[in-house]
Amino acid sequence: MNEFDKKPEFLTYQSDKMENYLYDYVLSYDGKTSKYINNYFGWDNSHSNNLDNKYSGKAFRPSICILICTSLAGTLEMALPPSISVELVHNFSLIHDDIEDNDKVRRHKPTLWTVWGIPKAIITGNSILVLGNKVLNEMLSNGSSKNDLY
């Protein structure tokens, strides 16, 4: 692990909250790609050398989302749904990028496509994108305005 793999200290609290929210949200999804999504995030024991099975992303983007929201008089609770949406969309792009670039390792473990094959990796990435969009749609259906999302 080098200095760029570590989470900046000031982001730890926000990213820990986001990771817990992300975990709960994704685990509530019970679709055909659930097992592949859980594998990708390291929340299972298969095909992973991540000993504590904790999500190992730096969570920089969602932490910035949380910091912006809270600095504009929002609360952490208000910021969590859009922050995980940002993280889900980012991870969708990483799965597809790994395939395009023929990358075999991400976050110190085999990439999704090398473990499960390209078709399952593409569908799993797409499912993660759908989850990211679903979070925002749920905010709108729960009374948030489009302006709240910006």
Locate predicted features.
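A short hydrophobic/aromatic micro-motif that marks alpha-helical segments and, especially, helix-coil
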Residues: 45, 112, 133-134, 141
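Short amphipathic alpha-helical interface segments enriched in basic and hydrophobic/aromatic residues
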Residues: 90-94, 133, 137
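Conserved N-terminal diphosphate/IPP-binding helix and adjacent helical/loop segment
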Residues: 1-89, 95, 99-114
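Membrane-interface starts of transmembrane alpha-helices
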Residues: 79, 117, 121, 145-150
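Multi-pass membrane catalytic core of lipid/isoprenoid biosynthesis enzymes
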Residues: 114-134
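Inter-helical turn/loop segments and adjacent helix faces that build the functional surface
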Residues: 71-75, 135-150
